[in-house]
Amino acid sequence: MNVSRKKYCLAVLFMIAALLFTACSGTDLQTEKTNMPPEDENLIVIGVSQLGSESMWRTANTNSLRETFSRDNGYFLLFDNARQKQENQIKAIRSFISQRVDYIVFSPIVEDGWDTVLEEAKEAGIPVIIMDRNVNVDDDSLYTAWIGSNFEKEGEDAGRWLEDELRGKKFSDDQVNIVVLQGTANSTAMIGRTE
């Protein structure tokens, strides 16, 4: 290879390298705010941490949230799927706090372990709405509202239904074997329905 061809190849390689480094760096810094809508859109920013997508009900719940918190309805949705891990939800909530969302909405995977991150949201002045399942915290002022079911009543109703059903079929106590599917351990739904 002659000298001019080597210089040409080196020049091309340097240009490609320069383009790669430029594309990966500083001209448009990637900050946590990049997910946020432009301020002139005047949208309410909602950070939602869904516990996962383990069932058709949860998928329908997620779809409902996406439809409700749409741009057409005046919202900008930041959505996170925690994949059944509390640490993922805590990380998402902290990300929402750092992005200064207007509201945080989440369905907690488990009942305990939320005091610290909810205190952080409260200190940041961000209202927290808990949906479906609830949390067990020392200070209920750490969240604004809980939207959910009476899980204990659901469990009682299911037990009464089963008792009536078996009685109607004339089963005796020694003829029945029952398997109870409880769901996520330590979730308010599981705790309430099995009390």
Residue ranges, per PLM feature:
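Bacterial N-terminal signal peptides that target proteins for export
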Residues: 2-11
